[in-house]
Amino acid sequence: MDLLKQRKMGILPEIDIAGHAYTVDLRLNELRNVELPNKKLSLDEMVTAPNGRHYLFFYDIESRSILHASSDMVTLPTNAVLVEIPDELGLDPVGMARKYGLSDEYFLKMHPYEKAGKATLTSLDKSGLPEFVVANQKLLQQDLQDPQKITFRKSP
């Protein structure tokens, strides 16, 4: 049975992220780990790439979770990569059509249904995260030199 027929029968597509298989579930707006279904990656937590056709996020390979860069990150994570995956139309054009009440074939001319995809991985040293961490380290040093800034920055 071909992939499109399987999809129309309800079999969800999968994507490989750093060697981990994830089920694409656009109804729930998430990628669900095939081996550990409680490990989910929410599409809402991902950033749209500049081209508007992909999502970007930092992925912790060990914990199988999205890694959020924040102002308190002062060390570079050891088991993480920058991940790029297609947007919803690239991941599951049939699922997108169903989400909006359209026919299953609606998006297929521009977005053919394909075999499970594989995420593009970029090492952290080429991701911009090291520079972000260095900037956070500098801010931390400034805060340590002026204790009032720590109180001001941490207050709600």
Where do the language-model regions lie?
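Extracellular/lumenal glycan-associated surfaces
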Residues: 16-34, 56-63, 69, 79, ...
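OB-fold/S1-family single-stranded nucleic acid-binding modules
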Residues: 72-73
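Short, flexible domain-boundary/linker segments around small modular repeats
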Residues: 1-17, 31, 37-67, 85
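Non-Sec secretion/translocation targeting segments of pathogen effectors
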Residues: 24, 133, 148-156
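A positional "C-terminalness" feature that preferentially activates on distal terminal regions of long
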Residues: 95, 103-128
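Eukaryotic compositionally biased low-complexity/IDR segments
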Residues: 88, 116-132, 140-149
